[in-house]
């Protein structure tokens, strides 16, 4: 997104479709002149004005509320005009066209995706983690995710990152001062307790990484794949977890030919449950395609549930399936149809007995799913996080570890010690956008809707 930030931008800020209220938003330098053209009068900043919205010809397009926010006290840090009218698509398009026409000589143009929030970031109204939280709040699919996004938007995550950054900068400042005045012959590592300071930093960073991983799970959810031979109850389990008849269930082996995906929530965590074609040798062309897709889904899985029929002994095909499952992916072997057994099912380590039809064992299955993915319901994770945040935190941890190795030597390697501290600081700064490439900014903001 290389467009100039010195010209006004305009867009419909509400979601597509019909609604009671729709909003057209304009942001840019000195919009008071545009307001006079649109309404024939001055607008008092931060006051609601009930006015007609008219075309250049005087035709009434709509009537509603106009709000004027003067820079820097606005969402973007620039002057902002918001026109709140009725939420019909045709009405909003006409209001937007009128704004573009009235502001043509001022350079008003259509906004690009995420451009309002990008301007808020560039004008220091929010940092990059908070800007991402705007999109996360819009996309939140559960109350827990919405709360986490709001916590990030309010700056809780950024405050934790900034606190660590400040401590690293302080330590680095002391190192640089020692390097600048070598004649003082100060034993830096001892005088400033560099080693215990590094240990405390590393411990606090490890805690932050663990919390960020929880935030990633809460934001992105888990990709859970149901895999196994035909007719072991994969579709029945999907329906039981979803609480609805999502997948077709018949006693005919091979009923499921293509994947069926359903999103459910457990403790606020979104789970994308994928029912797949049964795994077996077959000459059926269509079924073979479905089986090939099953293996692709298995490769993408965060958690694999390998379903088996508790009423049937494991055979060579079961062993072949297990041998081919990726070792890196958490696995739970689920024996279905335990309600048909004469004796209680005796589960071994890594196994669970359930009845998809009767609902037995499903609560335990839900708890196991979250545990396998690393979700800790008792852990403190008040904010959402992204994979890029975790990677940045991990890079910072690696640089602190390297600094610790240098600190285990003596003051002769202080320059290397200082460099690792600088790199750790840069990694943390990339989270909040204090040290971030334009390519990353473009990637982040391009995922926003146009009105944001």
Curated annotation (Swiss-Prot):
One of its GO terms (molecular function) is metal ion binding. GTP binds at residues 231-236, 250-256, 275-278, 355-357. It comes from the Bacteria. It is found in: Cytoplasm. Keywords: Cytoplasm, GTP-binding, Hydrolase, Magnesium, Metal-binding, Nucleotide-binding, Potassium, tRNA processing. (6S)-5-formyl-5,6,7,8-tetrahydrofolate binds at residues 25, 82, 125, 452. PROSITE patterns: G_TRME. Homodimer. Heterotetramer of two MnmE and two MnmG subunits. Belongs to the TRAFAC class TrmE-Era-EngA-EngB-Septin-like GTPase superfamily. TrmE GTPase family. This is tRNA modification GTPase MnmE. The lineage of its organism: Bacteria, Pseudomonadati, Pseudomonadota, Betaproteobacteria, Burkholderiales. The gene is mnmE.
């Amino acid at each position: 997104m290389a467009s100039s930030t010195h010209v006004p931008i305009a867009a419909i800020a509400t979601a597509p479709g019909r609604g009671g209220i729709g909003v057209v938003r304009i942001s840019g330098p000195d919009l008071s002149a545009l307001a006079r053209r649109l309404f024939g009068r001055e607008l008092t900043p931060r006051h609601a004005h009930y006015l007609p919205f008219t075309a250049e010809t005087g035709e009434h397009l709509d009537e509603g509320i106009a709000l004027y926010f003067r820079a820097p006290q606005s969402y973007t840090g620039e002057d902002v005009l918001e026109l709140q009218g009725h939420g019909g698509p045709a009405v909003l398009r006409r209001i937007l066209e009128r704004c573009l026409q009235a502001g043509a000589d001022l350079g008003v143009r259509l906004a690009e995706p995420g451009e309002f929030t990008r301007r808020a970031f560039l004008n220091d109204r929010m940092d990059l983690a908070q800007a991402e939280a705007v999109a996360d709040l819009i996309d939140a699919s559960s109350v827990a995710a919405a709360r986490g996004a709001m916590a990030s938007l309010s700056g809780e995550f950024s405050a934790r990152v900034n606190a660590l950054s400040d401590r690293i900068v302080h330590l680095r400042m002391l190192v640089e001062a020692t390097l600048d005045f070598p004649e003082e012959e100060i034993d830096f590592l001892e005088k400033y307790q560099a080693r215990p300071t590094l240990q405390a930093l590393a411990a606090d960073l490890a805690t932050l990484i663990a919390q960020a991983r929880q935030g990633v799970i809460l934001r992105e959810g888990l990709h859970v794949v149901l895999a196994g031979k035909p007719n072991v109850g994969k579709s029945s389990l999907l329906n039981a977890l979803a609480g609805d008849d999502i997948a077709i269930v018949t006693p005919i082996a091979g009923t499921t030919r293509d994947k069926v995906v359903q999103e459910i929530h457990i403790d606020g965590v979104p789970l994308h449950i994928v029912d797949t074609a049964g795994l077996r040798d077959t000459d059926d062309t269509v079924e073979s395609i479905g089986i090939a897709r099953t293996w692709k889904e298995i490769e993408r899985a965060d958690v694999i549930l390998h379903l088996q029929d508790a009423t049937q002994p494991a055979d060579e095909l079961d062993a072949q399936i297990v041998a081919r499952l990726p070792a890196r992916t958490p696995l739970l072997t689920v024996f279905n149809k335990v309600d048909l057994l004469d004796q209680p099912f005796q589960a071994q380590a890594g196994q669970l007995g359930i009845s998809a039809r009767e609902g037995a064992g499903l609560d335990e299955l839900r708890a196991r799913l979250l545990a396998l993915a690393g979700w800790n319901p008792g852990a403190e994770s008040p904010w959402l996080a992204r994979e890029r945040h975790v990677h940045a935190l991990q890079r910072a941890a690696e640089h602190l570890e390297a600094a610790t190795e240098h600190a285990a030597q003596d003051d002769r390697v202080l320059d290397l010690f200082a460099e690792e501290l600088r790199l750790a600081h840069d990694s943390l700064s990339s989270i909040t956008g204090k040290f971030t490439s334009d390519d990353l900014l473009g990637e982040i903001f391009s995922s926003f809707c146009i009105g944001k």
